[in-house]
Amino acid sequence: MIRDMRATVNETVPPLTPAHRSSARVHLGPLRGIPLVLEHFGVPSEPVLTTVGLRREDFETPDRSAAFEDLDRLFGLCIRKTGCDHFGLLLSQYVSLQSFGITGRLARNATSVGAALQDLAGFFLLHDSGGSINLSIHNGSVTFGYGIHVPGIRHADQVYDLAVGGMVNVMRELCGPDWRPAVVLLPRKRPPGLRPYRERLLSPLRFDSVLAGIIFPEPVLSRPIVDADSYLHTLLAENASAALARTDPLLHADVRRAIRLLLLAQQCSRREVARHLGLHER
């Protein structure tokens, strides 16, 4: 079903200078829990948010986005204010398919889990141009992962904790509330306290991984999605495709990113790069 998958790694890179600031942005839907988590620790959210030019109501605006680097700074502020080094993990409890707007609705109405994940991967750029969803199959196991391709992100561990927790939520929406991954991959050092991770993810944990993601058996991809609406899926796919066509992804940067991802997956060729970008091979 899903054979031409990609992989990515968490690389160590120097901090960005202003001259090298990325244009990558991310929609705030998956981050709407930030004010709630801050206030859980007794930290007023508005002073923290205004530091990066945001307001609480921005997180309730579907199309509101922020620069990837600003959100990196925001994670740093949140950690300092709360003293919690698993802030991203706590934030992940608020992530759902609805967090991803049209892409999430498209996935929710796909015919199967595999088709839903393909939709998420194919249209993820509409919501996050600083990272990519990665899917691969090996020896009967699927790896569903997320990789950052913006250099200089200092709090990548928080982003990956958020992403992995969000993946578990998405899979439970598609497969049922009792679903659990076989393994959770976390590209961060093993923390002193494992309890928050065990309670939140309910699965075996693998720290110091080269990938952020979850692993589950391949047959899960064939599971049908309950109450999926095929007609609505068709309409949403047309709208999502039109929205994607209107994006200006800075082609040269996208080519470099595609080549790096495909090299890591050992699938790099002119044909694969063209397919990855939706272009003719020539």
Regions found by a protein language model. Give the residues of each.
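Short, well-ordered alpha-helical segments
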Residues: 32, 114, 157-165, 230, ...
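Short hinge/gating elements
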Residues: 100-107, 149-153, 221-222, 238-242
